[in-house]
Amino acid sequence: YQSTAPADPTPLNEAWANAMRDVVAQFPNDPHILALGADALMNLHPWDFWLADGTSQPWTTEITDLIEAALEIDPDNIGAIHLYIHAVEASTTPERAEPYADKLADLSPNAGHLVHMPAHIYLRVGRYHDSTLNNMKATDADSWFTGVCRSNSFIYLGGYIPHNWHFGATTAAIEGWQAQANLLADGTKNAITPQMLSMAGFTGNAQQFVAQPLFVDVRFSAWDDILAEPEPAMDLLFLRSIWHYARGRAFEGKGDLAQAKDELAKLDTLRLSDETRAMKSVGRNSIDAVLEIASLTLNGEILSSEARYDEAIPLLIKGVAIEDSLIYTEPPDWFHPVRHSLGEAQLAVGDASAAESTYVTDLKKWPENGWALAGLKEAYMAQGEAEEANKVQERLNEAWVNADVPMPTSGGIPFAESAPKMELTER
């Protein structure tokens, strides 16, 4: 430990991890020691325990072995459960942490972050409604904590609190619960102060949080709400880029392709500017990658509306590839799976087999999400596979049980009047 943090903490982290290995060897039956040992090892490789294909990194097994040993001794160990969720959420078997995730919120009901934590597993296993509910409870716990403790911790106020709102908005949107997604997206935006938006090194994350209502409105085809949004301040480059993206989607959705193309041009000019690219990152990914996905998606949607599918589909395939290459984080740094737009275009051009493959792959990433199930059902119907389509319809019925909007088609829900925006006090 050093009172002044060094520019490179690696030597200190390595010394601490080696010291904790020695302590674990002395106290192998103490679950707290085992959890602290795992935590020390995790800090050597933060958020880097699994490759994109789910293969474990060379150091991962030592970490999970320590945590599992701690949980074998004490299945209710809060620290070990917290670490276990983070250690396996990006794996191909996140469900192994599910029994522990199910109990964590009740073990620590006043700690907002821990109440929220099960959502990291629920998102991966398709329990979107449970994720939404946990994050709603987490925001209540956060409100209690800040009221009692009057916390002025920037990390807590600017990171953990909006993260819970953001996560809940994401899963509410996946499950088709528009009113709650609106509420949670607004809460995400409202958690960010002007000071956070102007803070060097944090402005990208802050702007991503503030953009959440736009992303949710795109998901639910709330085109009029998007077009009613005022232009963000000139210095909020990522937020302005997403504003142009959302407006482009809205104009395209309403059939005004000339205006949609104008918004695409403005998006491209802004995202390729030196000032925007100097922001470097948003969330855990490069701003270049995230905004290129926005451009490719909007362009692909416009071209699809013009029935220029031979041009649209390659752009959407490129968007999928970039989306798949993004560094893992939850919620993902790109809100709308590009595969949903790609599958819709493939169906429109008559390539139902390719659309089936697209939606099946999406469902592997986001299990039982209703948006992809709707597309998969259409793909089976287009291929004359009525029995398979009926099976998927049953799954879609279950996936949409908590929704407050009509069942989606492959491209989303039909454009309609927006769901009413609830006040936060109505939760």
Where in this protein do the model-derived segments appear?
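Residue-level recognition of tetratricopeptide repeat
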Residues: D30-I33, D76-I78, A111, F145, ...
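TPR/TPR-like (Sel1-like) alpha-helical repeat modules
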Residues: L123, H129-S143, A172-A191, K261-L272, ...
